[in-house]
Amino acid sequence: MNDLDLNLVPPTAGSAYWRCVESKVESERLFYSRFILSPLKVGQANTIGLVMRRALLGEIKGTCITCAKFENITHEYSTMDGIQESVHDILINSKEIVLKSKSSEAQKAFISIVGPRRVTAQDIELPTSVEVIDPMQHIATITKKVKLNIELKIEKDSGYRRQNIVEYKDGNFTVDAVFTPIRSVNYSIHCFESHDKSIMKEMLLYEIWSNGSITPEEAIYEASRSSINLFLPFLQAEKEKEDFKGEDIHESNALHPSVSIVVDQMAKKVTFQHIFIEQLELSPKAYNFLKKINVHTISDLLDYSQDDLMKMKNFGKKSVEQILEALQKRFGMRLQ
């Protein structure tokens, strides 16, 4: 989304606020919501966006099947009499089952079904603390009157865990476990002028897709709490710090001026890597020239100095001045 929806811009200045502007259930295993956080100072949106994205994809716990035990099976690609799918296919299907658990402990579940019939998630005998999100998720097809017995291990964790081949023994097969309940996260940053047009502000727009075991709103809450917990040690350290002399602290933490400049420039590049040059509102000539030299974001533009632009063929002084003026006006920045 490159164009700013003016209806989302807060009507009055003040503290940043967070709200859901769209929410829908696309299927039992796909929930979608869109949020905005605004108004923010220039640079704050990307900082928050990066932290929240990491927390949403890596910190929120989810529940899934991590191991399946079959009777008289020794290899993942084995087939079973009367079962249409191979063991490998059943493992893949089991991996996709979306579950929700109130317990953090590893638990067992069972499938014990006589065919012929189709086996779905609703046929899993689950502990009382675990529920299935989509009962019709396919697991296997029994083509004749035989019994399918599978013992399942269910765990709750965060992130992703690869299978351990060493555990392929005694009919036990581990699967690649995708614990995160978040399917996808997108965010974009949009700049707008304050009401008196004296300063630029930012709006952070967030889109979240979940697997149905958690709503995007709940995910935002969990990710926020996780992110806040990261900074608690700094608050606790304040109570425990020793009584150093102010001048000693200042001297020990001081950076050489040249180092400070480099650090500041690197911070700016990271901050503006998601802000596109469209926000500068340049003339077609200046805009097209920047695109031609692969300058797509403000971060890309910071790789060039004023002299670099002036020396480029077919790039006039007027266009350079326009870029410098737009950078200063919208972001309070100058090229080296």
From Swiss-Prot:
Native source species: Huperzia lucidula (Shining clubmoss)
InterPro entries per UniProt: DNA-dir_RNA_pol_insert (IPR011262), DNA-dir_RNA_pol_RpoA/D/Rpb3 (IPR011263), DNA-dir_RpoA (IPR011773), RBP11-like (IPR036603), RNAP_asu_C (IPR011260), RNApol_insert_sf (IPR036643)
Source organism, top-level taxon: Eukaryota
Keywords: Chloroplast, DNA-directed RNA polymerase, Nucleotidyltransferase, Plastid, Transcription, Transferase
Protein name as catalogued: DNA-directed RNA polymerase subunit alpha
Annotated region described as Alpha C-terminal domain (alpha-CTD), given as residue ranges: 267-336
Entry's localization field: Plastid, Chloroplast
Domain characteristics, as noted in the entry: The N-terminal domain is essential for RNAP assembly and basal transcription, whereas the C-terminal domain is involved in interaction with transcriptional regulators and with upstream promoter elements.
Summary of the function given for this chain in its UniProt record: DNA-dependent RNA polymerase catalyzes the transcription of DNA into RNA using the four ribonucleoside triphosphates as substrates.
NCBIfam families the UniProt entry points to: rpoA
Pfam families xref list: RNA_pol_A_bac (PF01000), RNA_pol_A_CTD (PF03118), RNA_pol_L (PF01193)
Catalytic reactions of this protein: RNA(n) + a ribonucleoside 5'-triphosphate = RNA(n+1) + diphosphate
Gene Ontology terms, MF aspect: DNA binding; DNA-directed RNA polymerase activity; protein dimerization activity
HAMAP family recorded: RNApol_bact_RpoA
Family under the similarity heading: Belongs to the RNA polymerase alpha chain family.
Keyword check for Metal-binding: no
Primary localisation category: plastid
EC number of the protein: 2.7.7.6
Subunit record text: In plastids the minimal PEP RNA polymerase catalytic core is composed of four subunits: alpha, beta, beta', and beta''. When a (nuclear-encoded) sigma factor is associated with the core the holoenzyme is formed, which can initiate transcription.
Residue ranges of the region described as Alpha N-terminal domain (alpha-NTD): 1-238
GO BP, one annotated term: DNA-templated transcription
